[in-house]
Amino acid sequence: MQSDKKLKVLIVGSGGREHALVLAVKRSPRLGGLVCAPGNGGIERDCEVAAIAADDIDAIVKYAKENAFDFVISGPEVPLSLGLGDKLRAAGIPVYGPSKNGAILEASKAYSKNFLKKYSIPTAEGKNFTDADEAEKYIRNAPFDTVIKASGLAAGKGVVIPATRDEAVAAAREMLEGGAFGDSGREIVVEEKMEGEEASIMLMVCGDKYVMLPASQDHKRVGEGDTGLNTGGMGAYAPAAVATPEVLDAVRKNIVAPTLAGLIKEGVDYRGTLYVGIMITKSGPKVVEFNVRFGDPECQVLMPLLESDLLTIMQACRNG
C-alpha cells in the first residue's frame, strides 16, 4: 500500500537534465521538499540548491543523512559509477539509480561489449584493446569501417568516427598512447561502423520489470549539417518517429529482455534508468551503447511529455 507521506527529495547534478528532473518532480503531489546539488543558475530559480559537487559522493551522503532526505535521485553517471547508490543504500537512504555493479554498463564500454556478446544481444562486431599495435592490426584487417571508443567515461565525447583507416589508427593510438581521455582511454573498443538511424530508448527499471518512455533522438555532432566531433548532445526531440512500433517490439524482445535477464544472472539488482542507444539497421535494431541514467539532452524533451507522476514511478522502481 502506497504511503501518503510527503517526500523530501535531493536531486544530484547540475545540467539541463537535472533541471528537467526538478521541474518534473515539482509536479508531484507527493513532494514535500526539493533540493538540487549542486544545481545551476537556472535550477536555483525553481528549487533550493546546495553547493556540493556531484562527484563528492561522501559529502552527498553526509548531507542527505544530516538533512533527513527521504529520497535521492542521481542525474549524471559519474556519482553512480563511484558508488553513490551503494553508499546511500548502506546509509538507509532510498535512491533512484543503480549500484556500482550496474553502473559499470556505462562506466566501461569494454565491459558492456563483453556483456552484449555473452548474452547474444544484437550489436556491432568489435573487440577490446589495450595494445595500440594490436588495435592497428585489427583496424587494417577488418572487413568493415570502424568506430573507436574510449572504454571509460568521457562525458559523451569519447567516440571517434573516422573517415579513413589511417584516421582510425591515429585515433586508437591517440587514446592508448597519447593520453586522449586520460584513464578512460587506456582501454578502447574498436567496432564496426553501423549504418542506419539512431534512437534513444529510456527504460525505468526494477529488476526484470520496466516502463519504456517514448523513443527520442539526439544529435551529437558539433557542426552544422551533422559535421564535426561528437558531443554529449547538441539537441534532441521526442517522440522519434523512426522508432516505429515494429522497431520497439524488436527492442523489447531482442534487446531489453536479454539485457535485464543478463543483469540478473550477473547478480545485479538494477533499479534506475537504463538508456539503450540503438542503431536501426537493415537487419533490425542493434545496441550502440548503454547508459545508466537519463540522456542529456533527451531528458529535457521527455519530461514535459510525461503525464504520470515521476516521483511515484521512481519510488515504484526503488520499492519493486
Question: What is the predicted function of each stretch?
Answer:
Residues 44-47, 61, 104-110, 223-224:
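Short, charged, surface-exposed secondary-structure boundary motifs
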Residues 315-320:
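Peripheral (often C-terminal) accessory segments that flank ATP-dependent C-N-forming ligase machineries
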Residues 158-300:
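Internal nucleotide-binding/catalytic subdomain
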Residues 1-100:
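ATP-binding N-terminal substructure of ATP-dependent carboxylate-amine bond-forming enzymes
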Residues 49-55, 127-131, 162:
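Short acidic-hydrophobic, aromatic-tinged amphipathic segments that line or gate anion-handling sites
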Residues 96-158:
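A conserved helix-loop-beta module that forms one wall/lid of the active-site cleft
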